[in-house]
Amino acid sequence: MTTSYMNGHVTEESDSGIKNLDLASPEEYPKHREMAVDCPGDLGTRMMPVRRSAQLERIRQQQEDMRRRREEEGKKQELDLNSSMRLKKLAQIPPKTGIDNPIFDTEEGIVLESPHYAVNILDVEDLFSSLKHIQHTLVDSQSQEDISLLLQLVQNRDFQNAFKIHNAVTVHMSKASPPFPLIANVQDLVQEVQTVLKPVHQKEGQELTALLNAPHIQALLLAHDKVAEQEMQLEPITDERVYESIGHYGGETVKIVRIEKARDIPLGATVRNEMDSVIISRIVKGGAAEKSGLLHEGDEVLEINGIEIRGKDVNEVFDLLSDMHGTLTFVLIPSQQIKPPPAKETVIHVKAHFDYDPSDDPYVPCRELGLSFQKGDILHVISQEDPNWWQAYREGDEDNQPLAGLVPGKSFQQQREAMKQTIEEDKEPEKSGKLWCAKKNKKKRKKVLYNANKNDDYDNEEILTYEEMSLYHQPANRKRPIILIGPQNCGQNELRQRLMNKEKDRFASAVPHTTRNRRDHEVAGRDYHFVSRQAFEADIAAGKFIEHGEFEKNLYGTSIDSVRQVINSGKICLLSLRTQSLKTLRNSDLKPYIIFIAPPSQERLRALLAKEGKNPKPEELREIIEKTREMEQNNGHYFDTAIVNSDLDKAYQELLRLINKLDTEPQWVPSTWLR
């Protein structure tokens, strides 16, 4: 995987962290020049590698063009030479007749036909004989002297060896170039054609389908793909060629790196341009580069498989490496950056509290490497070496995702979200109050960045990014309390009551506290804990209640100790709470499992309520849907899972399945719960 990485999109980095966060307008977003090479999926443009056969074809074409130019130049020179005194003198010599020049004897010479031109191959003896004939033809002293020099040159052993080499190269260059495959997967192309032809009932389409399905055609296509795959493989570079190329970089310290890269394993590196240089910017976890440990950030790439890289644009590097696999030979100038040996990084697991789409992020260093995720996803962060851009895998994708993806670092995400909020507040117009409505006193907030190190608890006012998680398997004798959350008329109370009625030995509710007087049929400790108002208010001040309220001048509430009593009895405590109670519950030691009961569509919700004899107004239904969105937006980071209650029976079965799964499978919980 090779991409380009442009620095300075968002920050100026220093040892102290981020100096500046510049959120530009969409028109001013930096232009991405990253081109993913060898990246999983169909990313970027692909170009066939240049093989030796194709190079020879181009060389041969260049030679043909040079030959034509030489002929044109020769004609011009001939006009000038005809005016010379020497040629005038030679023209006075009577022409000889009957001279047989072996140069033009095609029967003795080897004539090779080429797609471009015919080449005559002569021996040294033929050249020597031709010069002898010319020597007898020219009678002036200057010509005789010139011919004598040529005869001596032809008899020289070095010239004869060079002449043989010339003939050998000419023969090789004259051979027709072998065809180069356009694609190596013609079988896939034929399958696409067959898919297109399925609905076609015309005679020609059916004939083509039958022809493509014929065994001989199928065998031909298979043979084509096998040969094409071998043809498209680059020829390995020899040590001699590598060492010869090193000499071109005289005083520079270079190193040679060889990496074996399989077709299905990306290289896993990013590059950037610095002037004419191509510099390795980032090593991505999971790629061949990271596994080899031979490529490092800051190395300058001089050559890849004998092809010079210095001076190339990152797009050209993309084209070059798009289909390379096998042995890759890099000639590098090692980075001058002094870095401590990399410490063994521990993998941390985090729960995402926001949605992220790299295609909509103008600041991601490489969009092809960006990892998209949704609120509630578990991410396995394997590298925080770059504090702004972590490398991570999404839960469940480790086997299908060979390369780690880039996700925003925690502090980076917090800072830019804080900056966005500040900008939005500054742009928000001041609404003028009306005469019949009191103007709301808007509290002025100090514009400071959120410091994650000072507070790990989340408020609705705080910026939610990630929460570190750990796997937890509940003990058999200490069940996690089940909390049902949802808007009114969404069925959470009905689901809770059905569980209580059907499995009384397994589920129980916490006994609430109250300040009202006990009635005759009530039993203290079974129906309510009856306490004084003074004691109740003292417990509120001490934070002992999960939630509480006042009804008809009496206080009611559910305490943490009441829930703990149910857990200690070995039963599962069932609670239906308001969202305001979730933070207190999460900060306790009860380890709650919170399930959000969401309503179905507005029409389906109307039908469900009609079965219960309710006839809600359209505005009431819209209010329920809007309340659902509000609860998800403000408290969704507390939810472990959600159930859409489109059918009460199905919702009950799904709820029971989730509760049973807590006994058989470990679940992700905040790491602070286990410390």
From Swiss-Prot:
Residues 479-660 form the Guanylate kinase-like domain. Changing residue 34 to A: No effect on interaction with PARD6B. CDD domains: GMPK, PDZ_MPP5-like, SH3_MPP5. GO terms for cellular component: adherens junction; apical part of cell; apical plasma membrane; axon; bicellular tight junction; Golgi apparatus; lateral loop; membrane. It is a peripheral membrane protein. Changing residue 379 to P: Failure to restore localization of PALS1 and PATJ to cell-cell contacts and to restore tight junction and adherens junction formation in cells where PALS1 has been knocked down. Expressed in the retinal pigment epithelium (at protein level). Expressed in the vascular plexus of the retina (at protein level). In the brain, expressed in the dentate gyrus of hippocampus, striatum and cerebellum (at protein level). Expressed in the sciatic nerve (at protein level). Expressed in the kidney nephron (at protein level). Expressed in the lung, and heart. Expressed in placenta, brain, skeletal muscles, pancreas and liver. Residues 181-243 are annotated as: Interaction with LIN7C. It is found in: Golgi apparatus; Cell membrane; Endomembrane system; Cell junction, Tight junction. One of its GO terms (molecular function) is identical protein binding. GO terms for biological process: central nervous system neuron development; cerebral cortex development; gene expression; morphogenesis of an epithelial sheet; myelin assembly; peripheral nervous system myelin maintenance; plasma membrane organization; protein localization. Residues 51-79 are annotated as: Disordered. Residues 256-336 form the PDZ domain. Its main location: Golgi. Changing residue 208 to G: Prevents interaction with LIN7C. Residues 54-79 have a biased composition (Basic and acidic residues). Disruption phenotype: Conditional knockout in the retina results in mice which are viable, fertile, and morphologically normal apart from microphthalmia with severe defects in visual response. From 13.5 days post-conception (dpc) retinas show variable morphology, including retinal folding, variable thickness and disorganization. Postnatally the retinal lamina is thinner, and disorganized, with a shortening or absence of the inner and outer segments of photoreceptor cells. The modification Phosphoserine is found at residues 14, 25, 83-84. Changing residue 36 to G: No effect on interaction with PARD6B. Residues 21-140 are annotated as: Interaction with PARD6B. This is Protein PALS1. It comes from Mus musculus. The lineage of its organism: Eukaryota, Metazoa, Chordata, Craniata, Vertebrata.
